[in-house]
């Protein structure tokens, strides 16, 4: 059972009565065949549901209205099987508030060269039916995606599936509640922002709860529940001598388990799926939540440190998008550099809170060590290195008049040396196209020091995210050149200024 089982995508066929009942019968037959095949063979993340043909303005408007009010409907896939005059779609599209994709396909893959006639031509008119639909989308400034390809083509399946992930994540985001335990880290700018504007743009709500409210729940956790969770730790991780049953830090592990159980209970009771903490506001907690946060992220919760609610929300959104995909997604921070000509590297980490979903496939180490920040008892944490390979880091920032998403494509590499004195999870990567260009572009665009790191998602996923939410995106990859990047930022300033 995944979040995608809670949603469905409606498959809508556009046509008209001009061609007669027999043509519409064939259109319906083709649609049923295609939808059944896609549901069976395409490995789509959620189910396609075929709706009645859209052959008149009233029918199309009714479908769009019903889609808006059906909580299970994540979006619409439209196939213009025959020509479907686009003025019929204006009223429906003008009220539609769900994501929209045009599947530019046709029932047959190859033309029947010897038998093709005008009946065949009238039945299979995606080539210009899709263009008519595209015009009205452009004319109405209607954001929608387009996937071209035969319905049996695996590349088309992959692209539709990726769009479905965006559609579902958008619906989930509209219900997302972010809990901030305490406020922002004092005097930090980028983690702040306009929470009302964020709710208007994305749909998620952000509110603050006193740490004392959390502490009350944490203190209510009984020893039996703690013992059961400790048993899970024992079976899942390699515990250092200090954290084992007779170790001098065993009580710290028990306290970490108490915090994890209390946090999870608090989040579940409040319906929260993302949260923040800050080391400056821990009154009543015996240690900074480290292990608890790591394990909650692995269960799908969004998180960011120092009150950074935008990154916490983005992490939750990206975890929904990547559900079921290979690779993990985590809160991350660009921490320090390794400057070496031709081999510049970024070491990413945080004080404690890196998600185990990105870890190498080996038993993780559970340890308790001193943390100088926060002024509390030594916290428990999982220590690991990160899987290697292509990845991205993404940052969502508030520019006052709009949101900007920054994405840097990176290549995660193996740590060349052991890190015996670094008791935190970490990731090591090469930034594309190189560290000087990537860091300068990131800084010029205002990117945060907190990011979401993902092996599971790629640049195309984040481009779709920006499009479906109608926000700016700034991309840093192997094609980035600083003069052109600066120009793009200037052009975006003008474009979004005119768009307000």
From Swiss-Prot:
It catalyses: beta-L-arabinopyranose = L-ribulose. One of its GO terms (molecular function) is manganese ion binding. Its EC number is 5.3.1.4. It comes from the Bacteria. Coiled coil: none annotated. Its cofactor is Mn(2+). Keywords: Arabinose catabolism, Carbohydrate metabolism, Isomerase, Manganese, Metal-binding. CDD domains: L-arabinose_isomerase. One of its GO terms (biological process) is L-arabinose catabolic process to xylulose 5-phosphate. Pathway: Carbohydrate degradation; L-arabinose degradation via L-ribulose; D-xylulose 5-phosphate from L-arabinose (bacterial route): step 1/3. The keyword Metal-binding applies. InterPro entries: Ara_Isoase_C, AraA_central, AraA_N, AraA_N_sf, Fuc/Ara_isomerase_C, Fucose_isomerase_N/cen_sf, Lara_isomerase. Binds 1 Mn(2+) ion per subunit. Belongs to the arabinose isomerase family. Homohexamer. HAMAP family: Arabinose_Isome. NCBIfam families: PRK02929.1 (NF002795). This is L-arabinose isomerase. The gene is araA.
